[in-house]
Design a protein with these regions (language model features):
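Glutamate identity and glutamate-enriched acidic tracts
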Residues: 43, 55, 73, 81-84, ...
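C-terminal, structured domain-capping segment
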Residues: 93-123, 130-131, 176-228
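Surface-exposed interaction patch
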Residues: 4-6, 12, 21-53, 96-163
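Generic detector of ordered, mature protein regions
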Residues: 43, 51-53, 64-66, 71-73, ...
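Short, polar/proline-rich extracytoplasmic segments that appear immediately after membrane translocation
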Residues: 1-90, 102, 216, 225-228
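Extracellular adhesion/glycan-binding regions together with long Ser/Thr-
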Residues: 3-9, 13-17, 85-98, 152-191
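Feature targets compositionally biased, intrinsically disordered low-complexity regions
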Residues: 63, 67, 118, 162, ...
Length: 228
């Protein structure tokens, strides 16, 4: 029997799960904030070395913190296969990274933004995508597509059965860190494009009834390096 779960937003803070027959009613909220379910922020800058964030490729309306979309309700889902139409099939489109800003659907979060050097000197920065909090191992069934300048990596927690990365994914870096890296020698006004796509993968063996009542909170942080 194929499994199918229904997700519904209950509060704008956590993923909260209850059950009704074979359904999950869940809030898909990725960070605790009042503006949306996804928060991206810069936590370290200086007068001459500074990062800013923008939803637009024109780098308009720069900010130190931006809020992504809220997901009100969704089924657990999967990535679309070739030639599948997400308007008629419950799946995550493969081309949302081509558009700026919020391109989320009913079943997934998709958000594109730009990190750019808003200072007057070249700089290096670190990026980390983190699990702030999770309960009932809901992170076992989460999938995250991270596009950096349109280059895709799919992240998932290691299989609890094999201890290896799930097929077609890169394993989370640690219990609390999905991925972290450093970008070097970014010139003034140079921008790096990021797209984050998040969904609960219904075809993951870990997407089971014991996740009912679970929650997860994520954050994404950018820090300028070399600031004294």
């Amino acid at each position: 029997m194929s499994k199918r779960f229904y997700w519904k937003k209950l509060r704008p803070i956590i993923i909260s799960v209850v059950t009704c027959c074979a359904f999950f009613f869940i809030l898909m909220a990725i960070t605790s904030n009042r503006n949306g379910d996804l928060t991206i922020y810069v936590d370290r800058t200086s007068v001459t070395k500074s990062l800013s964030l923008s939803e637009s490729s024109t780098l308009s309306n720069p900010k130190g913190k931006i809020y992504g979309p809220s997901l009100s309700e969704a089924w657990d889902t999967r990535m679309c296969e070739e030639e599948e139409d997400p308007s008629t099939v419950s799946c995550v489109p493969t081309d949302t990274y081509l558009l700026d800003g919020n391109n989320s659907g009913k079943h997934y979060i998709s958000y594109t933004f730009y990190v750019f050097n808003s200072g007057i000197e070249n700089l290096d920065y670190s990026m980390s995508l983190n699990i702030e909090n999770t309960s009932k191992n809901l992170d076992d069934a989460i999938r995250i597509n991270l596009y950096v300048n349109n280059a895709l990596t799919t992240y998932a927690k290691k299989s609890n059965v094999t201890g290896e990365a799930e097929l077609g994914t890169t394993a989370f870096e640690s219990r609390d860190v999905i991925v972290s890296n450093t970008v070097t020698d970014v010139e003034p006004n140079e921008a790096i494009k990021y797209t984050i796509v998040v969904w609960v993968d219904g075809y993951d063996n870990e997407c089971t009834n014991d996740k009912i009542g679970g929650s997860i909170t994520l954050s994404m942080k950018f820090s300028v390096l070399g600031i004294v």
